[in-house]
Amino acid sequence: MARHPRWTLSQVTELFEKPLLELLFEAQQIHRQHFDPQQVQVSTLLSIKTGACPEDCKYCPQSSRYKTGLEAERLMEVEQVLDSARKAKNAGSTRFCMGAAWKNPHERDMPYLEKIVQGVKAMGLETCMTLGMLNESQAQRLANAGLDYYNHNLDTSPEFYGNIITTRTYQERLDTLEKVREAGIKVCSGGIVGLGETVTDRAGLLLQLANLPTPPESVPINMLVKVKGTPLADNDDVDAFDFIRTIAVARIMMPTSYVRLSAGREQMNEQTQAMCFMAGANSIFYGCKLLTTPNPAEDKDLQLFRKLGLNPQQTRVLAGDNEQQQRLEQTLMTPDTDDYYNAAAL
């Protein structure tokens, strides 16, 4: 947390209590000061290791503690990962994210991780990873290999956290974010709405994120996807307006961060997603899966973009900017592959 917090809990609570339309108006004004309101960042991820996670996160079907029917998959071979990255670049992607269902990587995994980061970077792509907790040495090694972004979510408020996870502490999550930042890697961190938390807990989560010494460059806001076999399978549905309100407050509190619609978009109608964009969301994941749950197909996303007058964000890479952007737009228009799917709730 910053020495002199930018926000207090009472200030954040006041935002959550504002009339919704007034809140949306404020969020949209702030959004337009820092971003093109017609541009949405589109990200794609690959799971390099799925399932058999030793953690007990109550929302997660990848935990080995719950019987969800998910089949564990071994760590992908380096060439498999690089081949997927090549295909992603040919399809127009400029950032390639890799996720592994681990509590933390082991030292024996580091040469493998460094090799795939270096290989993907050599293609002119930005790199992102979500691997669980990192120590200082691991963060620095990934940074030296060329890793651009690292995802590690806080999930919820410190007060509610123990109801959801017991196998790692909240402070351990904060420590990982600090190590990532100190290594020079950009931070991606957010949370989940629908865990059974209160509005005060949602305020507490955003308070933690916004008061970090440097707020995350990317803030994914997930809506709980209830998976049979997990302890939260019977949780109440999230009210759409409550979710939209959370997006708006995140935008106001972290005006220069990308606020990303992550897990749960498959269960949102177009109207809800449109209001999320109005509230300041400006990033999505696309592909057939997000983590191990459904995500809207690329063609549905493009149709929604057309209806709302939105466009995939122009992103600079080492070479071929215009050509890659054209390929991305063409891929969104004519998706014909399931090779790319979102593997982690970022």
From Swiss-Prot:
Keyword Methyltransferase: no
GO annotation (BP), single: biotin biosynthetic process
Alphabetical UniProt keywords: 2Fe-2S, 4Fe-4S, Biotin biosynthesis, Iron, Iron-sulfur, Metal-binding, S-adenosyl-L-methionine, Transferase
GO MF, one annotated term: 2 iron, 2 sulfur cluster binding
SUPFAM superfamilies, per the entry: Radical SAM enzymes
Binding sites annotated in the UniProt record for [2Fe-2S] cluster: 97, 128, 188, 260
Domain of life: Bacteria
Quaternary state and interactors: Homodimer.
Protein name: Biotin synthase
Organism for this UniProt entry: Salmonella agona (strain SL483)
Record lineage: Bacteria, Pseudomonadati, Pseudomonadota, Gammaproteobacteria, Enterobacterales
